Amino acid sequence: LGDVYKRQLMEHCRKSRFFRAALVTLCLLTSVGFISADTLTVTGTVTSASDGEPLIGVTVQVKGTAAGTSTDIDGNYSIKAETGQTLVFSYVGMTQREITVTGPRIDVALTENSEVLDEVVVIGYGVQKKKLVTGATAQIKGDDIAKMNTTSPLQAMQGQLPGVNIASSSGQPGEGMKVTVRGLGTTGNSSPLYLIDGMPGDINTINPADIESIDVLKDAASAAIYGAQAANGVVLVTTKQGKEGRAKVTFDGYFGWQSAAKKMDMLNAYEYMTIQDESMLNSGAAPYDWGSFKSIWNYNADGQPTSVIDTDWIDTMFKDNAITQSYNLGVSGGSATSTYALSLGYIDQEGIVGGKDVSNYSRYNFRINSDHKLFDGIITVGEQASFSYVKSVGIGVGNQYNNSLRGAFDMTPLAPVYSDNGKFGSPFNDTSDSDWYANEGNPYGAMMTNTNNRNKVARFSANVYAQVEPIKNLRIRTVYGVNYSSSEYRSFTPLYQFSPYSQNLSQTRVSQNMNHDLDMTWTNTASYDWTIKDHAFNALIGMEANRYSGTYLGANQAYLKEGFDTWPYAWISNGTAASAGDGLGASGYPKDETRRVSYFGRLGWNWAEKYMINFTLRCDGSSNFARGHRFGWFPSVSAGWNISSESFMEATRGWLDFLKIRASWGRVGNQNISPYQFLAPIKTQNTHYFFGQYLGPNGVYNTGYDTVLGTNWGAYPSRLGNYDLSWETSEQTDFGFDARLFNNRLAVNFDFYMKNTNCLLYTSPS
């Protein structure tokens, strides 16, 4: 027993010693943890690595937190941080640095960021270093577009690109923007050419969150590689691609309200009545007896007038706090051989005039981009595909003389918006008690009643490509792109009466139409880059073929069946009109098919990235012109000099980081006219043609001319053809410079250009 007791006692002591040792160790580790979590006041100086001068305004931030500061006039900073945290030092034009906190003093030297000049910009059928570009271009990054929270990329581009003017045509949700590059250069369509990932497309249907960058080719030298389509400039949109790494999921959304920034100040009832009385007095007549106009008063339950009706029609037409919202979900990632990027987007914008029921725009977007390298990168294949679906409803935009708001400016404030029964019509259509506004209309009622229309557009765009690089720097590429769109429009006009001049008492009407459009482009290029000592060359040759076709089908009906004369039932099948005279009509036809074939090339040279020369040439053939006039030639030449790289500029390098002067000349073309204007199509019609004998209404054949008798079928040219139609051309000469100053904090771009348009294409007045 004694031995057993001794062993138990020794075991107890051993365990106790182990427990005490473990406790002491735990306390030490805990104290170390507390020490490591101590907050330090970190100070230091930030200087330039090139000259040792202190940098003012450097951002110093604790990574992953909101804590931050900036350096003072001497480059000094002070910030609180914990040991082990990371400080991020950021400065415009300098490479960002991250340093882990290990003590109270951290001095940092930042180096200049050469990537600013080594950035690439998208040019025709390729990319190029920004400092080697010899034409006039402008770029906006996708991150800057996303910050704008707009429904259209064009809205985000407003005011961001010099030489590019973007204006809204009406401000209605989903309404297109008017874009001009370096002013109007033609009497016809002045819109630039839009290329989405190298293929023609509609920029208005792109989700802004999908955009990597937008580059605008402004001068003819930059755009001449696109020849016949580039007379009004070129807008190149590059969408986001996948990157090597683990799958990355992003989501962003916003929800906001929009209201008119300023509305027209209208006269209230008292001011309006005062002005009317002054008008009468100035004309020598007695002022109005306002008490005699029963229709302009509000009445109490006893039928006694209490106050004058006082309607602000502008305020009524507008809707405050119209909702706008957008949501985007993206997934991207990939491996060393395959990358992908997918996105889903939804945008909805309510109109500030009328509200959602009469002015609204909704869009759904889907996009997938992928790239795959095969055989150690010798072959690369991929695709960019997108689908968009748009639903919209809109009020009549019109012009400054005829639009939905015009009536609100003219309308008296003494008229009510609604009648006693809550409808828009009375008292405007009740002349027995509307003596003051017997000839007035209800602009709000007209807008809410007549805006029965819906437009739906589905668009699918895709291009697939294959690229082979059999030897280094020789790339042979083929791309096939398709743009298909299908649209459906429906409108309905009910019966209404707001005044003698604002009414429809005859028939209900419905209209439906459908459009289908198919645009196909096939592009083949071969490019090669090579160097000989300090001389760098790049060459590109290619051909492109394009084909467009489409169909249209439309119909209209009238006199909708009773019980089916409201918007939900307003379809062609519910109309009862039996003839064209009653409102029945239908038409369908194939759209004019067009084709274009192009051959192009480019040769570029630079010496030590100091002197640059580029040549381009394109030949376009278009079915819009007659034989002998179908082909046009569009050359360009441009040169640049990075003068800041010269030794004699050494003294300026303390403040001048980069200076390039450039000059260019080029010719571009325009074929934006209706197809086959060189032909004189023959049209047949049942009209008054009297040649020889013809059958009269009495069943007897007659000769000569008699207006009493019926008509006969005849044929005639619907227009005069112009067989000599040829290309409209635009020549531009450009001189400019690009500069970056003060550690790339200030960028200056200057251009002087002369633009001459020759052989204008326009339709003669009929």
What is the predicted role of each segment?
Residues R7-I368, K373, I379-G382, S461, ...:
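Short, small/polar-rich motifs associated with maturation and membrane association
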Residues T239, F251, L329-S335, I368-H372, ...:
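Residues on the lipid-exposed face of transmembrane beta-strands in outer-membrane beta-barrel proteins
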Residues L1-Q8, Y762-S766:
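Conserved small/polar residues in nucleotide/adenosyl-binding loops
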Residues R627-F631:
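Short glycine/threonine-rich loop-to-helix capping motif typified by GTGT followed
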Residues P470-K472:
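A conserved hydrophobic secondary-structure block that centers on an alpha-helix together
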Residues E244-D310, I352-S359, R367-R459, R477-V597, ...:
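Surface-exposed loop/interface segments of Gram-negative outer-membrane beta-barrel transport/assembly proteins
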Residues F366, V597-L603, Y611-C619, G632-W641, ...:
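Extended, hydrophobic alpha-helical segments in both membrane/secreted and soluble proteins
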Residues I347-D348, I613-S622, W665:
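Transmembrane beta-strand segments that form the barrel wall of outer-membrane beta-barrel proteins
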